[in-house]
């Protein structure tokens, strides 16, 4: 189940429908610190300007959506000012939490389930 908590920073308002979204971007957080789960990343990104954001954070226990991607786009893609075709405006972003105390295989399975759901919902092959 996806839990939703909208962040207040580092998103840009843009009304778009699902057909505007062509790509799903998957990163890991790069944060191996103990306790660096989805909730902790939400709190970090919702506490001030980070010059970055994402749409989803996934750990071994939950999938946390922190941005309504139909109303805002997140700042997750280094898009080369549009030169490469994949932009923040035409993608949604998924961040995998890789903290040292997270069950990596469960987190990976949760990520796969989320991406499958997004592919179906957004009609992305």
What are these regions (language model features)?
Residues 1-125:
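Active-site-adjacent loop/helix surface patches within enzyme catalytic domains
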């Amino acid at each position: 189940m996806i839990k939703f908590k909208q962040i207040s920073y580092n998103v840009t308002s843009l009304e778009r429908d699902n057909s505007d979204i062509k790509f799903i971007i998957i990163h890991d957080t790069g944060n191996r610190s103990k306790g660096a789960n989805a909730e902790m990343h939400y709190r970090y990104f919702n506490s001030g300007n980070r010059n970055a954001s994402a749409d989803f954070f996934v750990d071994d226990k939950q999938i946390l959506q922190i941005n309504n991607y139909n109303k805002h786009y997140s700042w997750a893609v280094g898009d080369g000012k549009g030169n490469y075709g994949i932009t923040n405006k035409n993608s949604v972003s998924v961040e995998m939490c890789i903290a040292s105390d997270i069950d990596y295989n469960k987190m990976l399975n949760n990520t796969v389930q989320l991406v499958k759901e997004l592919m179906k919902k957004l009609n992305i092959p």
